[in-house]
Amino acid sequence: MNPIISAASVIAAGLAVGLASIGPGVGQGTAAGQAVEGIARQPEAEGKIRGTLLLSLAFMEALTIYGLVVALALLFANPFV
C-alpha cells in the first residue's frame, strides 16, 4: 500500500467527520434555542414544539452519521488502494 495514499485517507477521514459535524452542530444548537424560546412564549404548544424539534434533530444528526460512514469507508474499505 502506498504510504501517501494511506496518509491522505486518514486525513480525509478526519476531515470528513470534522466538517460533517460542524453544520449539524450549529443547526442543532440553533433549533434547540428556538424551541426553548417558543416553549417560553407558548407553554401550551410544548408537545407540538418538542415533537417537531426531535424530528428535526434526528434529520440533522443523520448528516453527521453520513460523514462518519464516509470516514469509515476511507479507513477500512479504501477504494483508492
Curated annotation (Swiss-Prot):
Matching PROSITE patterns: ATPASE_C
One GO CC term, this protein: proton-transporting ATP synthase complex
CDD domains: ATP-synt_Fo_c_ATPH
Gene3D superfamilies recorded: F1F0 ATP synthase subunit C (1.20.20.10)
Biological process, per Gene Ontology: proton motive force-driven ATP synthesis
Major localisation: plastid
GO molecular-function terms, A-Z: lipid binding; proton-transporting ATP synthase activity, rotational mechanism
Quaternary state and interactors: F-type ATPases have 2 components, F(1) - the catalytic core - and F(0) - the membrane proton channel. F(1) has five subunits: alpha(3), beta(3), gamma(1), delta(1), epsilon(1). F(0) has four main subunits: a(1), b(1), b'(1) and c(10-14). The alpha and beta chains form an alternating ring which encloses part of the gamma chain. F(1) is attached to F(0) by a central stalk formed by the gamma and epsilon chains, while a peripheral stalk is formed by the delta, b and b' chains.
Descriptive protein name: ATP synthase subunit c, chloroplastic
Gene name for this UniProt entry: atpH
